[in-house]
Amino acid sequence: MSIENKNTGVKKVVLAYSGGLDTSAIIPWLKENYDNCEIIAFCADVGQGEEELVGLTEKALASGASECHIVDLKEEFVKDYIYPTMATGAIYEGTYLLGTSMARPIIAKAQVEVARKVGADALCHGCTGKGNDQVRFEGCFAALAPDLKVIAPWREWTMQSREDLLDYLAERNIKTSASATKIYSRDANAFHISHEGGELEDPWNEPSKGVWTLTADPEDAPNQPEYVSLEVENGRVTKVNGEALTPYAALMKLNAIAAPHGVGRIDITENRLVGMKSRGCYETPGGTVMFAALRAIEELVLDKTSRTWREQVGAQMAHLVYDGRWFTPLCKSLLAASESLAESVNGGVVVKLYKGHAIAVKKRSPNSLYSEAFATFGEDQVYDQKHAEGFIRLYSLASRIRALNAK
């Protein structure tokens, strides 16, 4: 279970700690394999739920950590990571709103800040060697703290399964709520919760009802729709049903409203950064409503070329966030450019929630480029349809010349 040569160079390490099976095993493993190394547990509160934090400090100390730092990042996470990313229109492979991916840079940044505060010379994470998160965390560490050593136990130890980890903890009399029967790997934050593993590893299996934990089954959702109104300023949701709210509070309220209607469920097979495909089920109720509202206002206020540019930026931004490249010059540039475009994304939207769907049914904006007078199919006084003839001749000129040359 250990590495061959015990390390004596690392004096103090900050571990990204959740209290789950993996990180519970990492603390004693570090003590056994890194001589005289002090272990500082760090937990980022990104809205995963109070139940995940209860007793966490005591558990970390009982496992062998000397300190446990729980840092409240909820408001910062929504304000400085979720809102700016959504303003770019980022959505990975057409469906994934990047709930897990967006959380990694803020967690890594806070972990580095704790390391600097306590004078640590190493950072440690519990990401597996098959997943995206190892790249995301270590990419952020490289950008923020290239001088600190990174320890990745899953790439060092010989344990290969949940059963191995459970046996390892049992041998050391370390208690854990994990068990071999808990088959799903879950990751939660204020924006979403992800589910992987178990029967989901076979794409021919429909997800069982036990997979989903945050949203109602659309089949069991209310038979009557619910309407929710959102006010948007500069591409940010500022009010929900007329109530002015902070970014985090707005997201929480939308989660509570949308989840009972089964909104925000997706079941996707995505291309991981490390080359393999993986299947995940994601629940993003409030974020799905926000995304629908922002897109609705963009339809009103962005001209054709601006909207095309925003879609291109959104696609590029989705890959940057998914691939762990938040702290890069390109990401910074795309965020800044999107802020300029978001200055016109203002207005109100009413979203209809019904059995898994979130549909924008009303929208208005003081910056709207839509004119009923110009768009009407009835008799109008502001648009001379004869003007279209000259435009069409110029627009199709290249095609006309090509056809004439071909004769």
UniProtKB/Swiss-Prot annotation:
Superkingdom classification of source: Bacteria
Residues that, per the record, bind L-citrulline: Y96, S101, N132, R136, S185, S194, E270, Y282
Catalytic activity entry: L-citrulline + L-aspartate + ATP = 2-(N(omega)-L-arginino)succinate + AMP + diphosphate + H(+)
Pathway given in the UniProt record: Amino-acid biosynthesis; L-arginine biosynthesis; L-arginine from L-ornithine and carbamoyl phosphate: step 2/3
Main location: cytoplasm
GO molecular function, one term: ATP binding
GO biological process, one term: L-arginine biosynthetic process
SUPFAM superfamilies named in the record: Adenine nucleotide alpha hydrolases-like (SSF52402), Argininosuccinate synthetase, C-terminal domain (SSF69864)
Enzyme class at the top of the EC tree: ligase
PROSITE patterns in the cross-refs: ARGININOSUCCIN_SYN_1, ARGININOSUCCIN_SYN_2
Record localization: Cytoplasm
Keyword Cytoplasm: yes
InterPro entries named in the record: Arginosuc_syn_C, Arginosuc_syn_N, Arginosuc_synth, Arginosuc_synth_CS, Arginosuc_synth_type_1_subfam, AS_cat/multimer_dom_body, Rossmann-like_a/b/a_fold
Keywords: Amino-acid biosynthesis, Arginine biosynthesis, ATP-binding, Cytoplasm, Ligase, Nucleotide-binding
GO terms for cellular component: cytoplasm
EC number in record: 6.3.4.5
Cysteine pairings via disulfide bonds: none
Binding site for L-aspartate: T128, N132, D133
Positions of ATP binding: A16, Y17, S18, G19, G20, L21, D22, T23, S24, A44, G126
Subunit structure, interactors included: Homotetramer.
Family: Belongs to the argininosuccinate synthase family. Type 1 subfamily.
Protein name stated in the entry: Argininosuccinate synthase
Naturally occurring in which organism (per UniProt): Shewanella sp. (strain W3-18-1)
Lineage: Bacteria, Pseudomonadati, Pseudomonadota, Gammaproteobacteria, Alteromonadales
Chain's gene name: argG
